[in-house]
Amino acid sequence: MNHTRVEQNRGRTARKLRLALMGPAFIAAIGYIDPGNFATNIQAGASFGYQLLWVVVWANLMAMLIQVLSAKLGIATGKNLAEQIRDHYPRPVVWFYWVQAEIIAMATDLAEFIGAAIGFKLILGVSLLQGAVLTGIATFLILMLQKRGQKPLEKVIGGLLLFVAAAYIVELFFSQPKLAELGKGMLIPSLPTSEAVFLAAGVLGATIMPHVIYLHSSLTQNLHDGSRKERYSATKWDVAIAMTIAGFVNLAMMATAAAAFHFSGHTKVAELDQAYLTLEPLLSHAAATIFGLSLVAAGLSSTVVGTLAGQVVMQGFVRFSIPLWVRRAVTMAPSFIVILMGLDPTRILVMSQVLLSFGIALALVPLLFFTSNKALMAELVNTPWVKRTGWAIVVLVVALNIWLLVGTALGL
């Protein structure tokens, strides 16, 4: 009897710990449903129907492993990835890492900020510039929550993630995809043309985000509840739940685009404005409005996460920090320049995703080295299969980046 009670108490304590430590992965997961994902998933679904859904499944599984490793580094060492690189690498390498990480954070922010501005433009009928002003105001308001600590921010960003997921459940209801074909697309790999290969690379680039690899390790480095093993176990639950939601959203985006556009002959839908305007007559005004609202929610939350990641990168690499509102103001500038110059926002979005994919390997290689180091990680060191899988992901990402670069240079 006593033994049973002890087991029950232990189970209750583990559940409480899981709940207490839930949140960091929800902030990281927002990076996986930003407007760049909207653009690439819609283009892939409209062009190839359900044929590239399997890419989303595999990219999401890879992303889960990467986020677990990042969170584990923070738990095991009490330092984030940027700080570990600063402590272990020569100064010129650290400065190179800082500069490229800042460029990638700004490229990410450009995509996310413009995505939210497009969302405001679509649902309110304002200009893109007015949408950008609204985005700026909204992100400043969300960032003010940081003064109250990490938990309130986790709740707001987690709420926005759940809103986007709910919006796409509704979109699936409106578009009514063929479930048998959808299941086949998720399970059976196919790359019918060279364009499909490029879109698959784009989907992978838009799914795995280098800035949240840096950020997640900083969100877990100051967790102190329970033992290290208990914190790691709770964090795996956090990542599994948050990344499953993000994966569902990505699958739903592509499936909705396939059902609404591809099978009604609109295979060339590639821009967010175009997707909104095409959804309205095909499905309904409500479906188009929900799409616009989900774009605003994803853009706002991901641009806030991008600002936080930029702060972590600067503090970690060069031990220097600026107020969050100053960073927010500085990183907004490129978005306003793009809008005022009248450049094509969706093209800028897609280009930023290509740039992003080059930062993935640069973040992954040191992450794998550090998490495989027994002296650093103790009992949380990577197992042999995690090492092998991690290096396989690095090789795949580098190969796809070279493919993308060559293809872009040759205009394929």
Swiss-Prot record:
One of its GO terms (biological process) is iron ion transmembrane transport. It is found in: Cell inner membrane. One of its GO terms (molecular function) is metal ion binding. One of its GO terms (cellular component) is plasma membrane. Keywords: Cell inner membrane, Cell membrane, Ion transport, Membrane, Symport, Transmembrane, Transmembrane helix, Transport. It is a multi-pass membrane protein. The chain crosses the membrane at residues 19-39, 46-66, 94-114, 122-142, 156-176, 196-216, 241-261, 290-310, 322-342, 348-368, 392-412. It holds the Pfam family Nramp. Belongs to the NRAMP family. NCBIfam families: nramp, Nramp_1, PRK00701.1. H(+)-stimulated, divalent metal cation uptake system. This is Divalent metal cation transporter MntH. It comes from Cronobacter sakazakii (strain ATCC BAA-894). The gene is mntH.
